[in-house]
Amino acid sequence: MGKILAICTSPRRGTLKTPVPSAVLAPEWGIVGDAHGGSWHRQVSLLSAEKIEAFRQKLWVDYGAFGENLVVEGFDLATLPVPSFFAIGDAVLEMTQIGKECHSDCAIRRQTATASCRGRAFSRWCCAAHHPHRRRDEAAAHPGRSAPARGGDHPFR
């Protein structure tokens, strides 16, 4: 059983995200109010808290510094296949991509002058939001809520 430690959003792409107390996950959109919400395959990004903690041994960064929407703990994202599915309350996130390469104008690179966040070992996991029963409904996400991973199990069968 995994757990959400932080939810982070930003109104513009290419900027650091900031923690928020809660968010609304809209089906086929992602996090309402976040710049990456929309009709595409990378609506929500996950990053493991363990990867952030390892980076913090070198340099302190806040949650959201790597552009992640959800900071999660309790499962090894690197071992999950694409697609994998995460239940968060009534919402379902489908892992659509492992990793997102850091670009040359990356906000964390500008802040730290390093490319230490590159590579699969530090990848964000990109997801699309779904609702298992009522696709037009929205589900709230809150830090501390359990998020069980269901690797490879499609919830819409």
Predicted regions, residues:
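Metal-cofactor-dependent catalytic cores
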Residues: 1-157
